[in-house]
Amino acid sequence: MGAPPGYRPSAWVHLLHQLPRADFQLRPVPSVFAPQEQEYQQALLLVAALAGLGLGLSLIFIAVYLIRFCCCRPPEPPGSKIPSPGGGCVTWSCIVALLAGCTGIGIGFYGNSETSDGVSQLSSALLHANHTLSTIDHLVLETVERLGEAVRTELTTLEEVLEPRTELVAAARGARRQAEAAAQQLQGLAFWQGVPLSPLQVAENVSFVEEYRWLAYVLLLLLELLVCLFTLLGLAKQSKWLVIVMTVMSLLVLVLSWGSMGLEAATAVGLSDFCSNPDPYVLNLTQEETGLSSDILSYYLLCNRAVSNPFQQRLTLSQRALANIHSQLLGLEREAVPQFPSAQKPLLSLEETLNVTEGNFHQLVALLHCRSLHKDYGAALRGLCEDALEGLLFLLLFSLLSAGALATALCSLPRAWALFPPSDDYDDTDDDDPFNPQESKRFVQWQSSI
């Protein structure tokens, strides 16, 4: 299969494509993109399930660590205000983990933007291909209608005017037959007319899904950013209630991070299988959805010398018919106009129609060449297999950093808030001190009672 211009499978595609795949029975599955097959679906689900396994192991590790911390902690002597050894190390490890999580959030924003750019490039390529196909249909329809109108009006009028001269009538009828033949050949060039699959509809569906995917990731990134910032604030202010609330939120974001990691990993693996050799799948799917012949689809997907233009014969016959019409009209203009001046008007109208038809024909020749649609195909692959896949890998790195940072924070936060001084420590001030909170409270109560 020939590669589209400017597209070559990247190193990431080759690396992910080489990873082994297995179904639920752990039997090997070929790395061929086949989403309709059950074994391949199971292989991708198994990749996503690895993230679920990681989540389970993380939760077990956190639970065991916290149980050990709660049950095996040596009792502190009553009234002791000496911080336990290693307390500062625990707090700083939590801070470093949260800062690493913030770094992962930055990577996540970049990956989300890259993925969105790749999908936007895919949508733009589909829209340009839809414009090309619509232009072909419009030009064919306009040209056929012009030729049909010329046959019904100008050529009929010309035959009536030239009726006294049999040989001139025969020439006009020859031009009629050539116009009808050209219209018939041109009508077969609108190969996408009536096809149920619309690139415009596909582009709209892709953009619709991408908008919600982008928004979901932005909300996830902002949620984790808020959790990290408020946790750091709680540690700085030594606010126990804020740290406890953020611990619960960290657990929620940890679950979301592992879930997004599984989705990203399965998508990246499946996308690498598609991008390693996209032509067979695109060819089969498009043929199934459109019903077009494999010759037409192969011509536009491959666009090389090994595949001939399936419209070449129709184009040649149409060009020959238009040339014959042109020569016959020139002959009629030389011989008929001096004898039948009233024939000049329909002849001029026919020449104008022929000039417009030839202009449309040359546009059709350029549009029907494989270069334009094949270029759109290559742009779509570059957007999907380069930018979008790279963005997915950055999102995968974000999820990994996020899961590690939050797991570390969940282990450190309970130990950190256990080191916070109790609220009673703030009451160990002189009772006669006017700035003592308790004394101020009693003073306000005394004033209200007066």
Curated annotation (Swiss-Prot):
Alphabetical keyword list: Cell adhesion, Cell membrane, Chloride, Chloride channel, Disulfide bond, Glycoprotein, Ion channel, Ion transport, Membrane, Phosphoprotein, Transmembrane, Transmembrane helix, Transport
Tissue: Expressed in brain, eye, ovary and testis, and at lower levels in muscle, placenta, liver and lung.
List of residues that carry Phosphoserine: 440
PTM: N-glycosylated. Contains high-mannose, hybrid and complex oligosaccharides.
Cytoplasmic side stretches: 65-88, 236-240, 412-450
A GO molecular function held by the record: intracellularly calcium-gated chloride channel activity
Bilayer-spanning residue ranges: 44-64, 89-109, 215-235, 241-261, 391-411
Gene Ontology CC annotations of this record: chloride channel complex; filopodium membrane; filopodium tip; membrane; plasma membrane; smooth endoplasmic reticulum membrane; synapse
Subunit and partners: Homotetramer; disulfide-linked. Homodimer.
UniProt function note: Calcium-independent, swelling-dependent volume-regulated anion channel (VRAC-swell) which plays a pivotal role in the process of regulatory volume decrease (RVD) in the brain through the efflux of anions like chloride and organic osmolytes like glutamate.
Protein name as catalogued: Protein tweety homolog 1
Upper lineage: Eukaryota, Metazoa, Chordata, Craniata, Vertebrata
